[in-house]
Every structure is written in C-alpha cells, then in structure tokens.
Amino acid sequence: MVYWITGRRNSGKTTLAYRLKAQIPGSVVLDGDEIRELWKMGFSDKDRVRHLQRITKMAKLLEGQGHTVIIACVSPKRLWRKHFQKQFKESLEICMPFGELWENTEFEEPEGKK
C-alpha cells in the first residue's frame, strides 16, 4: 500500500506521514524535501516530473518488498499524481490543501443539537 500525501509547502504533510508511520508497522516514509535535497533539484515542471519519477521508483521498490510506503510530497498537478499512482499495486491520495493539520481535537455537538 502506498499513501501519497500532497499539499502546499508547510501544510503538515511530513507531520502526518510520521504520525501514520507510528501507527503502521513496517512502513517507510519518503519525504519529498529530503529526496529533493539528495539531487539538488529545481522547481521547473521538468525538474518536478523527474523528482516524482524518482520518488515513484523508490516507492515501487519498497512496496515490492512488502512495505507500506508513505509519500509526503508537494505534487501540484493532478495529472502527474494520477500518472505515477497508477504504477502502484494499491494507493490512497491524501490532500492537505489548506495548510492545517488538526491534532488531538474532539468534536462537540453545537448547543441544542445533542
């Protein structure tokens, strides 16, 4: 299984990825920022596609070895995400568009609705 967490910069993708990792034994996190730093990639469309290709190849390798893979990566174009996600046996896309991650919150019914 591959979880693909996407969203804007600083939206909590990596935080969520590591929270999931703590709950899923044998899972591996691929952080887009860390991987980008390995190859000193730019941000042109060409560089972004190449970056996603590398992440996808690493994720496929890990998935093939039986790991659950959690990708935390800015992936701005839906077409690109869909193309790369088709290469996995099973995947789930998690979008974080607003830059918010709520933790340890409880839902309370509005007054009069209980």
Residue ranges and their predicted role:
Residues 44-101:
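Glycine-rich phosphate-binding loop used to anchor ATP phosphates in small-molecule kinases
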Residues 2:
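Walker A (P-loop) ATP-phosphate-binding motif of ABC ATPase nucleotide-binding domains
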Residues 8-9, 14:
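The conserved Walker
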Residues 5:
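Hydrophobic anchor at the beta1->P-loop junction of P-loop NTPases
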Residues 14-65:
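Conserved substrate/cofactor phosphate-moiety recognition/catalytic segment
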Residues 96-114:
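Small-molecule kinase domains that catalyze NTP-dependent phosphoryl transfer to phosphate-bearing small molecules
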Residues 10, 34-37, 76-77:
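Short active-site-proximal "capping" loops at secondary-structure junctions
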